[in-house]
Amino acid sequence: MARFRASNILGDPFALATISIAILAWIIAFISSIIANIKMADYPNHAWWAIAYMFCCTIGVTVVVGSDTGLVYGVAVVGYLSAGLVLTSLSVNTLVYKGNSSAQAAAAGFILLSMIIIVWIFYFGSTPQATHRGFIDSFALNKEGGNAYGNGRPISTAFGHRPETTSTSAPQMYTSAQLNGFETSSPISGYPGGAPGSENRSSSQPRFGNPSASNLPANNNGQSQDEVPQPTEYPYRAKAIYSYDANPEDANEISFSKHEILEVSDVSGRWWQARKSSGETGIAPSNYLILL
């Protein structure tokens, strides 16, 4: 499971507000129930079970939000909260009509809990593509893929810049004097030695003194000098929660399917160096993966 970070709650106004209200409502219901149980002989027992159950649900939601795993455990959260809504509703129906003020205060606490549960079910039960969820997540400072919820799936560039792997600058232009014998012997592609009918057209003689293979620098390891060395260790394992198609213009990215298991060398950045079971290596967006 992902690491719990308090900043995921403190930096998310929606999470901070709903969790705070839920804790306050639970405290009101708990203290009022203690007083009502002392003053009343027929205080309903199921209200105590509702208090204990909602304590666990509130802790669970706090952990899920703090670890930013709402997409992973959203279905389970909705299921538990649905049962909690039934318990709090029954407690409200039983206590709100009591003549005791402490029982009515406990009912008020359960009403607040029920309202928060409804909001949570609507949030966690909605898909990431839902408009309201994307709007809520847009205010979060540390939400993974915060601006990606308006699309069919989270895009990897929605939460940060990845390392530059393609050139965006204009190509360097050289003159014939600067090249000094390194021009190609085929001015027109597909016609070795020049265009048809050109003077001294020959595919066997270099026209501009092309360097022979003996003059080229030797490469002992068989790799380009500009190629980034691949890591030798992949200590982490991650599971893909979405399918991803690599950018065809970027040879460093890799494609993978949903639920595929990848080996990861470093998890500190937004883009992870990963290796597939087939041995293919490359970079993968971290918001498409979850550590195992």
Curated annotation (Swiss-Prot):
Protein family: Belongs to the SHO1 family.
Nucleus found in the keyword field: no
Membrane topology category: Multi-pass membrane protein
Regions of this protein lying in the Cytoplasmic compartment: 1-14, 68-69, 126-292
Domain of life of the organism encoding this protein: Eukaryota
Name the UniProt record assigns to this protein: High osmolarity signaling protein sho1
Stretches for region Disordered: 185-231
Function summary: Plasma membrane osmosensor that activates the high osmolarity glycerol (HOG) MAPK signaling pathway in response to high osmolarity.
Glycosylated residue positions: N100
UniProt keyword Membrane, yes or no: yes
Residue ranges of the TM segments: 15-35, 47-67, 70-90, 105-125
Pfam families according to UniProt: SH3_1 (PF00018)
Stretches assigned to the Extracellular side: 36-46, 91-104
Keywords: Cell membrane, Glycoprotein, Membrane, SH3 domain, Stress response, Transmembrane, Transmembrane helix
Quaternary context: Forms homooligomers.
Domain SH3: 233-292
Residue ranges with Low complexity bias: 209-222
Subcellular location: Cell membrane
GO cellular component assignments: plasma membrane
